[in-house]
């Protein structure tokens, strides 16, 4: 294993932390409707839990309404129940075989709560990135101990890992700021 391997490994894991943050932030509801809001809703489909996208078409009706059309008519009740119980603050209404899910406007208080949640998610991602930096630095120290690299190489590798960490922390800050702005925009 070389310094480049340690750096590449750390970079890949840090990128996964960013992807996880993006996924978590997408679940946080803003004032506008988007189909990703229901991505993690699980529906009881003949005894097994499956994502809503596997049993229904999820579309945007307008800026504040999501339309859900189950492929099987008898799944309408199960899908509606799953959306209601998903703890998203949504209240679906069934019209025939189409479920309309209006997204209520966020109150100022709820917006502030959501920005705290967003900042918390950002902090968790930063902690993950910093832990990956620590792991990479420990790997570099182990390589020096095993005499696979010199101390100068370790120092250079540590500097490169720090630059990576700074880059990913800046990206996390940017994502959090964008989501905050999206939430606070009425």
UniProtKB/Swiss-Prot annotation:
This is Ribosome-recycling factor. Responsible for the release of ribosomes from messenger RNA at the termination of protein biosynthesis. May increase the efficiency of translation by recycling ribosomes from one round of translation to another. GO terms for molecular function: ribosomal large subunit binding. One of its GO terms (cellular component) is cytosol. GO terms for biological process: cytoplasmic translational termination. CDD domains: RRF. It holds the Pfam family RRF. Belongs to the RRF family. InterPro entries: Ribosome_recyc_fac (IPR002661), Ribosome_recyc_fac_dom (IPR023584), RRF_sf (IPR036191). Disulfide bonds: none annotated. Keywords: Cytoplasm, Protein biosynthesis. It is found in: Cytoplasm. It comes from the Bacteria. The gene is frr.
